[in-house]
């Protein structure tokens, strides 16, 4: 929604094109006064995009991209999933086989340029198009091109600032922090995001 709101053409993917169309129609109903270039397709159709964002539940991310490995070869793929589990009233981070969801995604599509990003942006804030999302987005990747492309997309969204968090080995810590933020959201009855200070030039 946010990327479509700033002029990018977005294609929603799902295992079935019909399901993707249902989601698309529901999103457009939320903002009837806006012209949003949002299409719908099955996962193979969505994988034809220049940049692919994987927004599945964490345990479905790697299998989903693995089935599309040929289509994703050479493309920037952005992983935004967090491996979390609920224990009682708390969310706790899980450690995927390769240390992070993003690393699992990269292993599933070795020819793709995987970046991890958008982990700490509240979903409701992303969908509230009438105001900016004031936050920093930590981006990490083993591919400079993926970091650059992802950071450029983030810069297009009002209020967001992309920060290069290094190689993909940082993704585990970045993803795990989400559990802390969710717990604080419950405690303070709010929707927290991340903003870092002390950067050069501030």
Predicted regions and their residues:
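Rossmann-like NAD(P)-binding element
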Residues: 30-76, 83-89
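Conserved Rossmann-fold NAD(P)-dependent oxidoreductase catalytic core, especially the SDR/UDP-sugar
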Residues: 77-99, 116
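A glycine-biased structural micro-motif
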Residues: 21, 48, 74, 111-114
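Short beta-strand and adjoining strand-loop segment in the mid-core
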Residues: 90-98, 127-145
């Amino acid at each position: 929604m946010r990327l479509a709101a700033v002029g990018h053409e977005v294609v929603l993917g799902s295992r079935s094109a019909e399901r993707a169309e249902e989601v698309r129609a529901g999103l457009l109903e939320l903002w009837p006064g806006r012209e949003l270039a949002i299409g719908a397709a099955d996962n193979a159709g969505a994988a034809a995009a220049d940049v692919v964002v994987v927004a599945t539940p964490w345990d479905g991310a790697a299998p989903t991209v693995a089935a599309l490995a040929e289509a994703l070869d050479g493309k920037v793929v952005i992983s935004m999933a967090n491996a979390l589990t609920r224990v009682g009233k708390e969310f706790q981070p899980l450690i995927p086989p390769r240390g992070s969801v993003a690393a699992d995604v990269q292993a599933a599509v070795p020819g793709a340029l995987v970046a991890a990003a958008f982990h700490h942006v509240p979903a409701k804030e992303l969908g509230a198009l009438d105001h900016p999302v004031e936050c920093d987005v930590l981006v990490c990747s083993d591919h400079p091109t993926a970091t650059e492309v992802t950071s450029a997309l983030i810069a297009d969204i009002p209020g967001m600032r992309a920060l290069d968090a290094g190689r993909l080995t940082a993704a585990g810590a970045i993803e795990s922090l989400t559990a802390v933020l969710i717990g604080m959201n419950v405690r303070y009855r709010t929707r927290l995001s991340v903003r870092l200070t002390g950067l050069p030039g501030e």
